[in-house]
Amino acid sequence: MKKAILMMTFGSPEEITFEGVADFFTNIRRGVRPQDHEIQTLYDNYVRIGGTPLQKITRQEVALVEARLGNEYSVYFANKFSSPFIPDVIGQMEADGIEQCICLILEPHYSFYSVMGYEKFLESKQIQFLVIKDWYQEEALLNYWADEIAKILKEEVKQDSFKVIFSAHSVPIFALDFGDPYIDQIFENSKLVAEKLGLSSEQYTNTWQSESDIGIPWIKPDVLEYLREQTEHPDHYIFVPISFISEHIEVLFDNDVECYDLCQEFGVNYHRPPMPNTDSRLIDALVNTVRVNENQEFKEFLPEEETFDELVPSDETKNILAESEDLQMPEFVKKLIEKKGRENVKMPYLIKKMLEKAGKLPKE
């Protein structure tokens, strides 16, 4: 039986031009082109950091995993929102005769927004898949963060006052209502690293970053808001973007530009440990994650035809809408539910699945 590992990541623009960024942004928005001013802002941010190394780094990570596991598995790489796209790579895997595939998402934590967003592309009548849900507890990865933070404390902070700020990509606040495990996993991850360092609860905190402006509330505190709200600052802030493993715009701009600029304004020393990137400890974590999970059950993924636009029976919409305030449901979902003149309304697939998990919508 031919087996494979499919390593997947979010993706990035194929070229740093206005239209290159526009194409990537449009893919993220599911084919709806953002307004020009939104594209311009993102384009300017990419220009400010000199482009993004994400694809280069990810391909190097893939090559290093392949060097360790290539005798047993064919190793493939795909992006969610840029080339090579997941469906295209699955097509190539089918042509190569692959029958079983371990899916390793290069995001250590499980979230409905991340893992479920990848699963929807896993459609094949030939290949059975095993999706690894999370791997943030891998000892090698925990040691990486603890070791790199310890270096900063020893070599740069020394006896000065400091605070370690663990930050993670934010998610919409209604994730709390749906029981998304991501938030608790971030807190646990931070605590595990802090314990390795012997930090007291006063020496570290958790914040969120990189939220999108799509008209819905996100988990707080945002890292920039946290910094602005402090009445006193330590001598040093150590920023640890723990939900990421590679350098990309949400680290190089959101941390190294925006957080750095605020530290300069407040007269505080800015530090950020290097991202794991291609470090051997990260590769150890990825390889061990495969080893720990490789004997689990593989299964077919045959999503319904209408992945992002599932049909919701109209007689259920009133109850959903009545509870939408408590759920802090996004306006765009309310508008979908409120549509008149049809027997069914369409609801984004992800929202439907989250409603099911929250017990707000009967499972089919």
Curated annotation (Swiss-Prot):
GO terms for molecular function: ferrochelatase activity; metal ion binding. It catalyses: Fe-coproporphyrin III + 2 H(+) = coproporphyrin III + Fe(2+). Pathway: Porphyrin-containing compound metabolism; protoheme biosynthesis. InterPro entries: Ferrochelatase, Ferrochelatase_AS, Ferrochelatase_C, Ferrochelatase_N. It is found in: Cytoplasm. GO terms for biological process: heme biosynthetic process. Fe(2+) binds at H169, E250. Keywords: Cytoplasm, Heme biosynthesis, Iron, Lyase, Metal-binding, Porphyrin biosynthesis. It is an enzyme of class 4 (lyase). PROSITE patterns: FERROCHELATASE (PS00534). The keyword Cytoplasm applies. Its EC number is 4.99.1.9. Coiled coil: none annotated. Signal peptide: none annotated. The keyword Transmembrane does not apply. GO terms for cellular component: cytoplasm. Fe-coproporphyrin III binds at R29, Y118. Involved in coproporphyrin-dependent heme b biosynthesis. Catalyzes the insertion of ferrous iron into coproporphyrin III to form Fe-coproporphyrin III. Belongs to the ferrochelatase family. HAMAP family: Ferrochelatase. This is Coproporphyrin III ferrochelatase. It comes from Streptococcus pneumoniae (strain CGSP14).
